[in-house]
């Protein structure tokens, strides 16, 4: 799980660096790996058929991420963005873009959303942005209770 496990297995920390062009690249790959572990696709695909179920799942995964990697969400960008800011920002944007696309897909697939919930001014993409912003805010506040977000979803979409 960390350097302690590397030492136990008698792996030279320096040898790990040989696989990457820079420390920033190593940290970036590690951050991506952690994000992927936290938000890995669940066994139950029903999670992505319903916005409320998806939001609950996302907040559960955020709580899991906090338990497994304390401080990761609030500090992850600092380490890999210092040395190579452009690459770090690009990496973070790719991860976030993937999450946003997933939210859009769920919003498009949820058959319980009332007709007319979306229009030209209030699109699926804009609501996905709102949900994502609420998620990022929850991450920074370490607040993994989705109740308020679920109520917003219920009142807005159903």
Where are these predicted regions, by residue range?
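Short, small-residue-biased leader/transition segments that mark boundaries at the very start
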Residues: 2-7
């Amino acid at each position: 799980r960390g350097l302690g496990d590397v030492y136990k297995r008698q792996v030279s920390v320096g040898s790990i660096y040989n696989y990457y062009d820079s420390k920033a690249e190593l940290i970036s790959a590690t951050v991506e790996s952690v994000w992927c572990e936290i938000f890995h696709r669940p066994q139950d695909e029903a999670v992505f058929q319903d916005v409320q179920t998806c939001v609950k799942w996302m907040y559960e995964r955020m709580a899991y991420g906090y338990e497994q990697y304390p401080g990761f969400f609030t500090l992850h960008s600092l380490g890999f963005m210092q040395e190579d800011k452009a690459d770090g920002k690009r990496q973070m944007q790719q991860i976030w873009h993937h999450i946003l696309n997933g939210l859009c897909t769920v919003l498009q697939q949820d058959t319980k959303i009332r007709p007319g919930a979306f229009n030209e001014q209030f699109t699926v993409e804009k609501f996905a942005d709102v949900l994502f912003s609420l998620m990022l805010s929850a991450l920074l506040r370490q607040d993994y209770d989705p109740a308020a977000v679920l109520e917003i979803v219920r009142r807005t979409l159903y």
